[in-house]
From Swiss-Prot:
<keyword id="KW-1003">Cell membrane</keyword>
<keyword id="KW-1278">Translocase</keyword>
<dbReference type="GO" id="GO:0005524">
    <property type="term" value="F:ATP binding"/>
</dbReference>
<dbReference type="GO" id="GO:0048502">
    <property type="term" value="F:ABC-type thiamine transporter activity"/>
</dbReference>
<dbReference type="GO" id="GO:0005886">
    <property type="term" value="C:plasma membrane"/>
</dbReference>
<protein>
    <recommendedName>
        <fullName>Thiamine import ATP-binding protein ThiQ</fullName>
        <ecNumber>7.6.2.15</ecNumber>
    </recommendedName>
</protein>
<dbReference type="InterPro" id="IPR017871">
    <property type="entry name" value="ABC_transporter-like_CS"/>
</dbReference>
<dbReference type="GO" id="GO:0016887">
    <property type="term" value="F:ATP hydrolysis activity"/>
</dbReference>
<keyword id="KW-0067">ATP-binding</keyword>
<keyword id="KW-0547">Nucleotide-binding</keyword>
<feature type="binding site">
    <location>
        <begin position="32"/>
        <end position="39"/>
    </location>
    <ligand>
        <name>ATP</name>
    </ligand>
</feature>
<comment type="subunit">
    <text>The complex is composed of two ATP-binding proteins (ThiQ), two transmembrane proteins (ThiP) and a solute-binding protein (ThiB).</text>
</comment>
<keyword id="KW-0472">Membrane</keyword>
<dbReference type="InterPro" id="IPR005968">
    <property type="entry name" value="Thiamine_ABC_ThiQ"/>
</dbReference>
<comment type="similarity">
    <text>Belongs to the ABC transporter superfamily. Thiamine importer (TC 3.A.1.19.1) family.</text>
</comment>
<keyword id="KW-0997">Cell inner membrane</keyword>
<dbReference type="InterPro" id="IPR003439">
    <property type="entry name" value="ABC_transporter-like_ATP-bd"/>
</dbReference>
Length: 215
């Protein structure tokens, strides 16, 4: 569950105001022109930006002033932020232990998560040996390994070709079902999400301008 109550953020020359309630396990797309406030909205929810006023509730808890690591949120960007000197398995494991000192049970969990996104055969490879789609699978697996109930995606697949985007969106839908995730995804291709999301929110000039319920 995501609830923003009169959240105000004084962003440079465009003050932002957000009010929204997203139900548990709901899947919502965020659209709008560049600079409208879409990424800032996700950063406020994740805690990378601090609201100047209002409240941010996540899964029934007030997280307005908590640190990003304390919030029940994982976030995936267009830039997958993989470390080229680490293997696929190690890059995924960072989501669990930044020092990579894993127990046998944790190592097993990393491999299970890699398998869930179709990476079992690539665990020993470095990111430089992967395709764009495979790199995003690694980043997605790292997010999932954190086992947070809310997943925020900021145009994560926009650099991929249409066929790969469709493949990743199908995988995302499957994982949301299996893990009962609440999803918020920023996109410039909302038509590709038809049948995969519950509603579309349009952001204009730092506020929600339209709420299109698809179900």
């Amino acid at each position: 569950m995501i609830k923003l109550e009169r959240v105000y953020f004084n962003y440079k020359t465009m003050p932002m105001n957000f009010n929204i309630h997203i139900k548990p396990q709901e899947r919502v797309a965020i659209i709008g022109a560049s600079g409208a406030g879409k990424s800032t909205l996700l950063n406020l929810i994740a805690g990378f930006e601090r609201a100047d006023d209002g409240e941010i509730w996540l899964n029934g808890v007030n997280h307005t002033y908590t640190e990003p690591y304390e919030r029940p949120v994982s976030m995936l960007f267009q830039e997958n932020n993989l470390f080229t000197h680490l293997t696929v398995e190690q890059n995924i494991a960072l989501g669990l232990k930044p020092d990579l000192k894993l127990s046998a049970a944790e190592q097993s969990l990393v491999r299970q998560t890699a398998s869930a996104v179709g990476l079992s055969r690539f665990l020993d490879r470095k990111p430089t040996a992967l395709s764009g789609g495979q790199k995003q699978r690694v980043a997605l697996a790292r997010c999932l390994l954190r086992d947070k109930p809310i997943l925020l995606l900021d145009e994560p697949f926009s650099a991929l070709d249409p066929a790969l985007r469709a493949e990743m969106l199908d995988l995302l839908s499957q994982l949301c079902n299996e893990k009962k995730l609440t999803l918020l995804i920023v996109t410039h291709q909302p038509s590709e999400l038809q049948g995969r999301i519950d509603r579309i929110l349009t952001v204009e000039n730092g506020h929600f301008a339209k709420n299109n319920d698809l179900k």
